[in-house]
C-alpha cells in the first residue's frame, strides 16, 4: 500500500515534514487513498488574495490548499472554454470525431465569433473548412470564439445543443453545479461555474488528456499565416507554468485557471473577479508561489 499526501512544511525534531509526516503515516496504515489536507483559509488568518473567488489545489491528490468563496456560482467568461475543449477531447477519445475532420465556419460562427464580432478570434474566413485540431488550437491558445462556435456546430449541429452536451458532460465528470448556454463564455444567464469546479475540470483535463493538455503550454499558434500568442501570462514566468486558460467579460471581471509544477509538485490555481490583467497575473502567481513555498508532496508510506 502506498499513499501520497500534501503536508505543510513545519519545523520539528522530525525534519521538514514534521507533524504532517507523523499524522500522514498513521493515516496511511488504515487508508490507501490520498487524504486531502486543507491549508489556511482567509477567515483564519491565512493567505489573503484580492480575487473575489479563488482556490488552490494539489493536482495529484486533489487536496485543497486554499479557498475563498470557491463554491459561489459565477459567470466564467472564456474559462468555460475549458469545458468546450473537454467535450471535444472526449468526442475524439470515444472515436466519434477525428482531429483531422474538417468543419465549416458558418455565417453564424463568423458573425458572432469572427472578425465582425470584435472578440477573440482566429479570423477564419466565412465558409472556410478548418480541421478540428486547428480549431482546438484556436480555442486553447487564442481563446477564439469563431473556433468555439465552429466546433459546437460541427459536433452538435447548433450551439444550443452543444451547450446542453457541455452541461451533460459536466455532470458525467463530477461537476454538479456548472451549467452552460454557449460554447464561448460570452454573457449568458445559463453560463455559470464555481472556482472549485473550474479547478476540478482543470485537474480532469490534465489527468485524462495528456496528449491535448500540452496544447495549453504552447506559446503561439499560426493559422492561415496569422500568428497569435497564448493569453496565459503565467507561461512567460519562471514558475513552471504549463497551462491553462484566461477569461474576461465586464460582468465576470478578469479570471484565470492555471497550473504549474515545481519539484514534482503540481498545483492548480483558479482566481476570478479581478480588476485588471495585471492583477489577475499577479494574484495567480502569488498564490502559486505561496503554495510551492508552504506545501510539499511526497510518498510517505509503501508496503
Give names to the regions the model predicted.
Residues 1-53, 96-98, 298-303:
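N-terminal secretory targeting signals
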Residues 7-16, 24, 54, 87, ...:
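A residue-level detector for conformationally permissive "hinge/kink" positions
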Residues 14, 22-28, 102, 134, ...:
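Residue-level recognition of conserved structural "scaffold" positions that shape functional pockets
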Residues 15, 157-158, 249:
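Glycine-centered helix-coil hinge/cap
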Residues 18, 22-24, 46, 54, ...:
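Residues at the start of alpha-helices and the adjacent loop-to-helix junctions
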Residues 33-196, 203-207:
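Active-site-adjacent loops and short helices of periplasmic peptidoglycan-processing enzymes
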Residues 175-179, 187-303:
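Domain-terminus/edge residues, biased toward the C-terminal soluble/receptor-binding domains
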Amino acid at each position: 500500500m502506498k499513499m501520497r499526501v500534501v503536508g505543510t512544511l513545519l519545523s520539528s525534531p522530525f525534519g521538514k515534514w514534521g507533524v504532517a509526516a507523523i499524522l500522514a503515516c498513521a493515516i496511511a496504515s488504515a487508508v490507501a487513498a490520498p487524504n486531502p489536507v486543507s491549508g489556511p483559509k482567509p477567515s483564519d488568518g491565512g493567505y489573503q488574495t484580492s480575487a473575489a473567488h479563488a482556490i488552490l489545489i494539489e493536482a495529484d491528490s486533489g487536496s485543497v490548499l486554499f479557498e475563498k468563496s470557491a463554491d459561489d456560482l459565477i459567470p466564467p467568461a472564456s474559462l468555460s472554454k475549458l469545458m468546450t475543449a473537454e467535450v471535444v477531447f472526449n468526442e475524439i477519445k470515444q472515436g466519434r470525431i477525428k482531429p483531422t475532420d474538417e468543419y465549416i465556419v458558418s455565417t453564424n460562427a463568423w458573425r458572432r465569433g469572427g472578425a465582425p464580432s470584435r472578440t477573440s478570434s482566429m479570423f477564419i474566413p466565412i465558409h472556410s473548412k478548418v480541421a478540428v485540431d486547428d480549431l482546438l488550437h484556436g480555442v486553447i491558445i487564442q481563446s477564439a470564439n469563431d473556433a468555439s462556435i465552429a466546433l459546437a456546430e460541427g459536433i452538435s449541429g447548433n450551439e444550443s445543443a452543444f451547450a446542453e452536451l457541455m452541461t451533460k458532460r459536466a455532470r458525467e465528470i463530477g461537476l454538479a453545479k456548472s451549467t452552460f448556454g454557449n460554447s464561448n463564455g460570452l454573457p449568458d444567464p445559463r453560463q455559470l461555474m464555481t472556482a472549485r469546479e473550474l479547478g476540478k475540470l482543470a485537474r480532469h483535463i490534465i489527468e485524462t488528456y495528456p496528449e491535448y493538455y500540452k496544447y495549453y503550454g504552447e506559446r503561439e499558434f499560426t493559422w492561415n499565416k496569422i500568428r497569435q500568442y497564448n493569453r496565459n501570462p503565467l507561461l512567460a514566468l519562471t514558475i513552471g507554468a504549463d497551462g491553462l486558460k484566461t477569461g474576461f467579460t465586464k460582468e465576470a471581471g478578469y479570471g484565470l485557471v492555471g497550473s504549474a509544477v515545481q519539484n514534482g509538485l503540481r498545483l492548480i490555481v483558479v482566481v476570478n473577479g479581478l480588476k485588471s490583467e495585471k492583477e489577475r497575473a499577479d494574484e495567480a502567481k502569488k498564490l502559486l508561489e505561496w503554495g510551492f513555498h508552504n506545501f510539499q508532496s511526497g510518498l510517505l508510506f509503501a508496503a
